[in-house]
Amino acid sequence: MLSRVARCSRTLNQVTRNGQSGLFSAVLRTSIRQNSTDSPASNNANEIYTKLSDTKDPQRNQFFQYTWGSWLTNDKSKKKQRETTFSIEGLTLFIDRINQLESKLAQPKSLEGAFVLANNKELLGSTKDKVIVRSIASIHEGKHHRVYKITLNTGKELVLRIPYKLDSDVAIASKLKSEVATTDFLKLKLGLNVPRVLAYGVDSNNEIKSPFILQEFISGELLMKKWHPLLPDSEETNKCLHEVIDPIAQFQNKILSVTFNKFGSLYFHDDVEGSLQNDVPYEGETDSALSNRWRIGPSVERQFTRNKNKLQQSIIDQYNGPWDASNPTAVLESVADIELENAKSKLSLINADAGANENDRALITKQIKTFENLKKISPQLINDKSKSIMNVEVLFKPRLYIPDLDPLNVIQHSDTENYFIDFEGSTIKPFILTSYPKFVAYQGAKIYNLEEDVPGYKEMEELEKQQYEFMYYKTRNERMWEFELNKYRHDLIAIASPHIKVLKSPYLQALDVKNGKDYLYVEGSIVQLQAMWEAYVANELVNSKDTKFPIEYTAEYLDQHQQELSDYQLETVSSPFSATGGWIPQDMFDTLKAQGILVETKDGNYKVETEKVLENPPAQPEEK
């Protein structure tokens, strides 16, 4: 998929201003390439010339449309959610206004409905004239936002990130505020290589007419280009894998150096409510310019916003924190609470609809049962004072967690300098409740030595060998990550314990609920605890002294759950593109449609013609 994601666009050339400022023709390029990186030239770039004053120019529309892929169902509505219309004229006016501000380190300054970090004003460059946008290129259509590259008449380049309308307005605003503050913290407090943010807007009431982040453009290649996770063991392979794992592990190590005073997410001081402004986020700040810069507010972890559009904000606010550092169990319970409330809200809407689908009602009812079980067991999952867990108190302290630490979000700016991007959804939580970065995480059966752990491996057919080799390579990569964690933070290595992984699995599975039937994985992880519960109680690993398992399951219920889980897994692996939610890269979609593999139905959706697939099976795209 990387080759698809890293499509190229033509190198930007400056264009001459045509007439007076505000009337010149801006160049809009709709070609796609990876976020904030340079790529080889492409002859497929689609250039659009438009006057900034002509806000109704129909040529602009395609510049804002989602083009990176299509969906098998509800394609039009999903693309509509991903339209990123903004004011091109307003952008150039806003940027010039920033240039007139004094450069100093202070709280973000309100400007025409947006907020400016004036200390980063130098990103605009210098000119005796007005700062003007010369060209705009669409360089990446991501999972949560679209990225545009802005070229100025000063020769400087910026990135404009526009979020998709996938969440409520309140959720989008909170996520933007927290991401900018987190980026600012990483830069100013920890001195890490992250893009500097120039300005941000949390809604459409600004000159750009859209929520946005305007930040530094970082040139370079993605670290992902060096990631080859399934290479056979060799000295060269070990070196290649470490070239990717090491810088990310070092970045995490620096993040873990700060212990916070609460669980939640980072914001600027003025972006949290008054009752939270008196509480410093961490102790020991000696720089007066930073002592009142950040505060801890409600968590923006994705489970508090994902698929919560129909849940009242007042209910969400009851469960998204912040929480006191002395109460880590509240972090566990909050996820069960929010998912249970969300399921109950959906059931109420279904019950109020006379024409509701009975299958939907049955599905939601089962979800409610699972999240009631999760709510019951969450306070007991891990004993935060257990003597059997090494450095348990350290593991439960509040630390910053970035969910998208990934080589796709690392730009190699030079041979020795890596820049990290994308801090959406970052949260402060106990380290013991975090998961490994997805590029190294592996939840399957572990194989540490092919010949010792797999009986008869040498005599197997090649295809069967490859299946076990895949499991071995995934195990190897995760172990390499754990070795790096142990090297930098031996005091936190207990997170690698298989028992800790099993105990926190219900919580992590709940965090990963995306589709209606994903509750089955949550229930399965709870059921898994039953066999070991007595041993966990005896060793004080769980927060309970009762050897009786907290959830009472009947044999009939367990059989039904196992059957439904097996059916769902079979449905997932046998349904083309189910892993991507029915999303297909646009070039592949067009090809499959031309081949007759994808056929449009009467309701405007698409179905896969099985016989055509057998003739010419498509490759599965990676989840976007």
Swiss-Prot record:
Transmembrane segments: none annotated. GO terms for cellular component: mitochondrion. This is Altered inheritance of mitochondria protein 9, mitochondrial. InterPro entries: Kinase-like_dom_sf (IPR011009), Mito_inheritance_9 (IPR051035). The gene is AIM9. The keyword Mitochondrion applies. Keywords: Mitochondrion, Transit peptide. Disulfide bonds: none annotated. It comes from Candida albicans (strain WO-1). Residues 1-34 form a transit peptide. It is found in: Mitochondrion. It comes from the Eukaryota. Belongs to the AIM9 family. Its main location: mitochondrion.
